[in-house]
Amino acid sequence: MTLTERLREKISQAFYNHGLFCASYPIPIILFTGLCILACCYPLLKLPLPGTGPVEFTTPVKDYSPPPLTSDHKPGEPNEQPEWYVGAPVAYIQQIFVKSSVSPWHKNLLAVDVFRSPLSRAFQLVEEIRNHVLKDSSGTRSLEDVCLQVTDLLPGLRKLRNLLPEHGCLLLSPGNFWQNDRERFHADPDIIRTIHQHEPKTLQTSATLKDLLFGVPGKYSGVSLYTRKRLVSYTITLVFQHYHAKFLGSLRARLMLLHPSPNCSLRAESLVHVHFKEEIGIAELIPLVTTYIILFAYIYFSTRKIDMVKSKWGLALAAVVTVLSSLLMSVGLCTLFGLTPTLNGGEIFPYLVVVIGLENVLVLTKSVVSTPVDLEVKLRIAQGLSSESWSIMKNMATELGIVLIGYFTLVPAIQEFCLFAVVGLVSDFFLQMLFFTTVLSIDIRRMELADLNKRLPPEACLPPAKPVGRPTRFERQPTVRPSMPHTITLQPSSFRNLRLPKRLRVIYFLARTRLAQRLIMAGTVVWIGILVYTDPAGLRTYLAAQVTEQSPLGEGALAPLPVPSGVLPASHPDPAFSIFPPDASKLPENQTLPGEPPEPGGLAEGVHDSPAPEVTWGPEDEELWRKLSFRHWPTLFSYYNITLAKRYVSLLPVIPVTLRLNPREALEGRHPQDGRSAWPPPRPGQGGLWEAGPKGPGTAQAQRDLTLYKVAALGLASGIVLVLLLLCLYRVLCPRNYGQPGAGPGRRRRGELPCDDYGYAPPETEIVPLVLRGHLMDIECLASDGMLLVSCCLAGHVCVWDAQTGDCLTRIPHPGQRRDSGVGSGLETQETWERLSDGGKGGPEEPGDSPPLRHRPRGPPPPALFGDQPDLTCLIDTNFSARPQLPEPAQPEPRYRAGRRAQDSAGYDFSRLVQRVYQEGGMAPVHTPALRPPSPGPTFPLAPEDEAGFPPEKSCPSLAWAPSTDGSIWSLELQGSLIVVGRSSGRLEVWDAIEGTLRCSSEEVSSGITALVFLDRRIVAARLNGSLDFFSLETHTALSPLQFRGAPGRGSSPASPACSSSDRVACHLTHTVPCAHQKPITALKAAAGRLVTGSQDHTLRVFRLEDSCCLFTLQGHSGAITTVYIDQTMVLASGGQDGAICLWDVLTGSRVSHMFAHRGDVTSLTCTTSCVISSGLDDLISIWDRSTGIKLYSIQQDLGCGASLGVISDNLLVTGGQGCVSFWDLNYGDLLQTVYLGKNSEAQPARQILVLDNAAIVCNFGSELSLVYVPSVLEKLD
């Protein structure tokens, strides 16, 4: 078994177990899934509802003025401004973005020093902003003149009264945590606790207090003991009521003068106006809502044609809920992970989820409803999932592989889409496997099995067809037969055999081809390729950033490039566009600002272990406010009872501020308790929470090499994934016989439909079989070795037939019946039995109904039965209590052959009474044999000359129901010319099949023989008490092949060893297993040197045939074992009364698979190289896949014909019916031909079918056997 096959088998088994679990516990699983959906959708409260998201409009900063209150736009003219952009905004928001770091980093600094000193500078900045005054010709303006004045907070916000400003300008900064008091800040021993003490314990959906005061998302602030970059970011938020360009420009120039950012490239060119809606926009919801309505309607109208679905509305609603929940879970999880998707109808993501979810729903529905309806609900769900497991996982792996490759392209747009796709695929898979599968099991469970008439053929379950000229598919032409003898239920092609509606054809086409998902995957690959080809800078930018960040030199050690004058202007006439203020003088290199103290030399040399973190400014810093919650600004204004519904605010360009702090300031600002904290300074060798920089050129080279190794590893991983993906596509798209000549799909189309569009149906023929008559009662045991056929009826008569010609070779009557050894007498007895059996039918048989039997001329007719016997009624005595007790014999005496008088018999001698009655009646006395005691030893040789039977008695040809002390025959086996018989008395007999003589026998024991195995020279007898006896058969002369009459048939095996009448046969007891089972043994098989027993104690045991050593005890059934199969390949199959079938590995004793097969006992079981065929008391024949344990199809038999099956070859199955046999193609489940066995056999069902080696079939019709040869058309087909 290859790796792919093993993986496929593991996946199939896992899905099968999952299906059983979902169908067994539906309510808990649905509740658990509902809780998971609610938990994953809870973060959606952070997002706006569809259509309620903020709307933006951008205008240039230069020459900006608030729009008028009324729009002067004329109707019909194009207008670039939105309708809501009228009048002044509620407020103008100015953010001062601060990035601060301690540089250079001292090795003795603590983790808290990363953010304590940078946060302390926020108080200084707030003072500078409040003290800023603009003096011009129009007068003096301060912050109080232009800012938004607020009053009291809402009454319910008492906890925030000391944190948010009241009765003054709305100005927010991290200093608000300490009431803008620097002394409070320095006295605070735990800054982290102070910041997070107002955070909610649960997941907060609106803007938190930390986000409001810091102005940036929490993960970008850097205020954490676990940060890896020693960089702190926060904003000081100013809210203005009026727009004053000069005041804002002077404030920007002053801050950039005091805290310059030399490498800043932020553009201050535009204002962003953000409008907030109040109600849901119905117009934007229409496309998405329409899509889901169409999905609901399509699934409903499609499932109306599926009879196996109880509630069409419920299933359609469950599909819509599954798809919608998958979408909401995906967006909720993405929000929880930090992504902020939108649910606007214009996004493509919701529609992709709809397409993928719909296709998965159709796949699961089609797979489950295609399972056999006679199975339990949980088995149908398990088989449906198992059959589609490989396809589901294969598509899932392919999609994840494409997403993984797309993510490693490092293009931001592709990476964002890949993150969404991964979350969407996982959530959709989760809901399909748990929610929809469980709902589908509940719906199918509601379909009561009583509502489905299993006896009706499939065409009876269809709605009445419209009158058309041509008959519909699977509608058979009228025949002379009243009804079909079977009903077949195919799993893979059950719906293909019917004329499907077009809507179901579309569903099954989408489910079979998975067209939508493959198109999406192909489109994703093309889109990723186009983006990578057109924007390859994503990878280069990433690599350059990695090398720059880990460079030991940085930008400070690089020599300044000579730049011509005029290329990079140092200032701009407009202060808003100037990098440096007009009055700022250029500082010499490595010189601090005038107000900044010089760095002490003692700390500047040899005390830092990492370079200064590079403070960089990128385009993403211009709009960092976009990463805040959409409820950030509405929440802030709502605290002061100001609503933003149907109004807008204007965000001014960000003012960048860079703060570089030296280690002395960090040490001076440290709290006394920080030194005793549990956070020691990082060591140079540690790579845990901190980024340790290189210490020398060697370390720098190692870091640079490590970056290259990372890139190489990513490339290697992408290459491996791509190769595996191509290999999987090759395995999927190319068949196994790819490239082989003549390996086309034409053979599979042969016989796919039992009745095609042209009205072709499998042929029905009638032949005259060879009828084997000779039994008065029903035949109980059948055995054959290919050339000979042995049958035994309930009366105890054994007949030996020639399997080629159908002639009766020998009859072995019941031991209590007198027997004539002459041939003529045997023929007369045959004719008497024939006359008796024919007379029992109520009338003479019509000529031509059955072929005449070949026989010799018979003698004079015998007298009537019991005519020569006297009336023994007077000898009957019912007073048993008055009878004297006979003493038991002290020792058993040897048994002699029939026909010899027993000497010193211990039983009562009735001969005197019988002789007296004969004399009174005037009849001649007869010889009455006495009972034979059992023989004493395990070895039982009998010479041929001792085989004298009863004396000839032609006047009494048949005593069918004479009493016998030997017991009835319970088991029968045939090999060569020897017949082994096991009787209810526990006696084992070996008979000559040709001569009809008893060759040897064993002693009688108290337990009868329930099963026999006759293999080579070994005989194994299983007894009613659970014991096993191993016998060895020996002859005094060499065994010679038996010369059979007639040419050997096709496929016949070499003749089994036989012995002539002159050989002495001895049967030795070699081994005995006294307690093989606790209860009676019901099944016994042997092959490949192994003996397998099955018992009513629910277990199987595997013995070694040569020494009777028990190898394994197999437990897996919950009922008694009824049938066992084993072949030369060590494959063992067992069936029990629990209706289950187990496949075992005889080499290891492990159970390979367990299948719930029938509603009742499993009556027969056989295997081919690829299939397992079982039958049960429910008159159902099931065909299973041998490797996966999946049910392929089932055949409903006539009442009483459930066990009548046989395998002619690996591709041909024969089943019995009411007077007929049917031939099936095992590969496709197609009915090839039905053969009726004449008029006489129509009234009785075929109870048993035995396939001979010469392509002949023996059918058991009660007291008669029919020998049928396989039709020639099937021989050519096979």
Curated annotation (Swiss-Prot):
Keywords: Cholesterol metabolism, Cytoplasmic vesicle, Endoplasmic reticulum, Glycoprotein, Golgi apparatus, Isopeptide bond, Lipid metabolism, Lipid-binding, Membrane, Methylation, Phosphoprotein, Repeat, Steroid metabolism, Sterol metabolism, Transmembrane, Transmembrane helix, Ubl conjugation, WD repeat. A motif (ER export signal) lies at residues 447-452. It comes from the Eukaryota. It is found in: Endoplasmic reticulum membrane; Golgi apparatus membrane; Cytoplasmic vesicle, COPII-coated vesicle membrane. Residues 284-442 form the SSD domain. This is Sterol regulatory element-binding protein cleavage-activating protein. The lineage of its organism: Eukaryota, Metazoa, Chordata, Craniata, Vertebrata. The keyword Ubl conjugation applies. The modification Phosphoserine is found at S821, S837, S850, S905, S935. Loop-1 binds to loop-7, enabling interaction with COPII-coated vesicles. When levels of cholesterol in the endoplasmic reticulum increase, Loop-1 binds to cholesterol instead, thereby disrupting direct binding between the two loops and preventing the SCAP-SREBP complex from exiting the endoplasmic reticulum. Cholesterol bound to SSD domain of SCAP or oxysterol bound to INSIG (INSIG1 or INSIG2) leads to masking of an ER export signal (also named MELADL motif) on SCAP possibly by moving the signal further away from the ER membrane. Residues 731-1278 are annotated as: Interaction with SREBF2. GO terms for cellular component: endoplasmic reticulum membrane; ER to Golgi transport vesicle membrane; Golgi membrane; SREBP-SCAP complex. Glycans are attached at N263, N590, N641. Residues 40-279, 334-344, 423, 540-707 are lumenal. The chain crosses the membrane at residues 19-39, 280-300, 313-333, 345-365, 402-422, 424-444, 519-539, 708-728. It is a multi-pass membrane protein. InterPro entries: Beta-prop_SCAP (IPR057042), HMGCR/SNAP/NPC1-like_SSD (IPR053958), SCAP (IPR030225), SCAP_N (IPR057041), SSD (IPR000731), WD40/YVTN_repeat-like_dom_sf (IPR015943), WD40_repeat_CS (IPR019775), WD40_repeat_dom_sf (IPR036322). Residues 1-18, 301-312, 366-401, 445-518, 729-1278 are cytoplasmic. Ubiquitinated at Lys-454 and Lys-466. RNF145 triggers ubiquitination of SCAP, likely inhibiting SCAP-SREBP complex transport to the Golgi apparatus and the subsequent processing/maturation of SREBF2/SREBP2. There is a cross-link at K454, K466 (Glycyl lysine isopeptide (Lys-Gly) (interchain with G-Cter in ubiquitin)). Belongs to the WD repeat SCAP family. The keyword Lipid metabolism applies. Residues 535-710 are annotated as: Loop-7.
